[in-house]
């Protein structure tokens, strides 16, 4: 009978969304998470499709890349929800530390959502301001503090997974991205100044125009659909994008709207409905920018673990060397292979450790 560790089953994350722990700081009613069903899937985004849509105007898609034998390498790509008529700051998808409060309209969020957003942008001062505001609640000591602490700990655990400096981080590091080819490199500098969570989000949401694998280059697209500038990740190319957001409401029914929209009218012949039998080409705006280089070799250092026979041979060699008379000097030998030197060094270190 196989034994299964209890920690592996009880501590498994059931929600990989950074907003998954958000709940009102009022314990009077039960609260269900608004996260979309994909929050249970560890797809590397660490934010569900719902929150990615309403906060960063991006929905998830997959980019299947087939090879010569029919095998498919799947890569995620974000779908822009920015309409072609949108102008100005409303075209910013992922803002920077300098403008995220205005772009994300932070004042319209609840205190719990504000706290998570400040944690994403690593704004410690703003996090403290939210905690001070919570202290005015009469139930702060008995209930509110416990809820805030639980939400903070769960959100911190998700954010830690996106930090490449963390031990055993889940962020993929076997690739390199080049965002721009100009000498100024504004896109690269802005990207490096982003917090770890947003750097990972941009990496998984923005697919490359070109993918370099060993000596092969796959040209997926020959022009970008977005850009990274001083305001963040921006859908700067005004492509026709009539997409309807799956989760966001685009208008308020209580407010009168006057629209000037494009409309097609005509019979089946005029609209060429007979062509609907063919495979449709979707009019969407995938986020694509720069070049990605995939490293096919392992990023971890390879080494050989010594066996029991190796240690026995080492003991015999050590005892024979101590009993034998000194040998005459031999001619200098050629350089030994690096793998052999590393293997012998491992055995010697183990022998010194045993002799202590």
Swiss-Prot record:
Keywords: Capsid protein, Late protein, Virion
An example Gene Ontology CC term for this record: viral capsid
InterPro entries: Baculo_VP39
GO MF assignments: structural molecule activity
Pfam families xrefs: Baculo_VP39
Main location: virion
Intracellular or extracellular location(s): Virion
Further remark: Expressed late in infection.
Family the entry assigns: Belongs to the baculoviridae p39 family.
Protein name per Swiss-Prot or TrEMBL: Major capsid protein
């Amino acid at each position: 009978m196989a034994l299964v560790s209890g920690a592996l089953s009880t501590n498994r994350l059931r929600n990989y969304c950074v907003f998954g722990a958000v709940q009102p700081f009022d314990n009077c009613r039960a609260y269900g998470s608004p996260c979309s069903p994909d929050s249970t899937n560890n797809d590397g985004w660490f934010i569900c499709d719902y929150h990615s849509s309403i906060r960063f105007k991006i929905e998830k898609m997959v980019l299947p890349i087939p090879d010569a034998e029919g095998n498919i390498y799947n890569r995620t790509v974000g779908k822009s929800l920015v309409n072609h008529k949108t102008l100005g700051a409303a075209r910013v998808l992922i803002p920077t530390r300098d403008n995220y409060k205005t772009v994300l309209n932070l004042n319209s969020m609840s205190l719990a959502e504000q706290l998570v957003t400040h944690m994403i942008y690593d704004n410690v001062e703003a996090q403290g301001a939210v905690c001070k505001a919570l202290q005015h609640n009469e139930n702060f000591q008995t209930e509110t503090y416990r809820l805030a602490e639980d939400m903070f700990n769960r959100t911190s655990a998700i954010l830690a997974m996106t930090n490449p400096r963390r031990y055993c981080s889940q962020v993929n590091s076997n690739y390199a991205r080049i965002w721009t080819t100009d000498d100024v490199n504004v896109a690269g500098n802005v990207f490096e100044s982003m917090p770890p969570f947003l750097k990972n989000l941009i990496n998984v949401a923005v697919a490359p125009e070109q993918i370099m694998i060993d000596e092969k280059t796959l040209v997926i697209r020959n022009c970008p659909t977005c850009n990274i500038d001083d305001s963040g990740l921006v859908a700067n190319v005004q492509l026709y994008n009539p997409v309807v957001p799956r989760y966001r409401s685009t208008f308020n029914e209580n407010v009168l709207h006057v629209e000037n929209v494009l409309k097609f009218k005509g019979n089946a012949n005029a609209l060429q409905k007979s062509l609907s039998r063919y495979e449709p080409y979707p009019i969407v705006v995938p986020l694509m920018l720069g070049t990605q280089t995939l490293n096919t070799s392992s990023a971890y250092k390879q080494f050989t673990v010594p066996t029991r026979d190796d240690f026995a041979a080492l003991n015999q060699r050590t005892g024979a060397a101590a009993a034998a008379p000194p040998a005459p000097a031999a001619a200098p030998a050629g350089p030994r292979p690096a793998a052999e030197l590393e293997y012998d060094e491992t055995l010697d270190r183990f022998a010194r450790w045993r002799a202590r």
